[in-house]
Amino acid sequence: MNAEGKRARLAQGPESFAEAFKVSHETIHRLEAYSSLLERWQKTTNLVAPSTLPQVWSRHFADSAQLSALAPKARLWLDLGSGGGFPGLVVAILRSGDPNFRMHLVESNQKKCAFLGDVARTAKALVDIHPMRIEQFAENAQSLRADVVSAR
């Protein structure tokens, strides 16, 4: 098992996540707010498989954090089909201390966009949310040169 896989296995909750990924208490508080909003919104909007909610730290947050670690110098990240915000919104929260970093989230479902906006505001994540289909976004953003493109 590689180092990133070991980190994900160890990140069973906020404390172990902080230790595994070397993040601040402030970042953990932001992710805890995200987790709370995810639970609340999940009742009315299908954001993740319901069976995965108890493993939000290891299954969703740690998986997303591993991607952030693979591209530490990325300045512009594009997350397609953002849905519940994985990995894009988690990466944006982890990189919130970098004023040169920007995350673009593309999601066609309006309810999911509202969720993404709610989490972004609460967690103070610098993101641009594009409420449209990927094809529409591609037509409108031809000059956007992303360092990383992700989709889950």
Describe each PLM feature range.
Residues A65-R152:
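Conserved SAM/SAH cofactor-binding pocket of Class I
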Residues M1-A74, L78, K111-A114, D118-A125:
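Class I SAM-dependent transferase core
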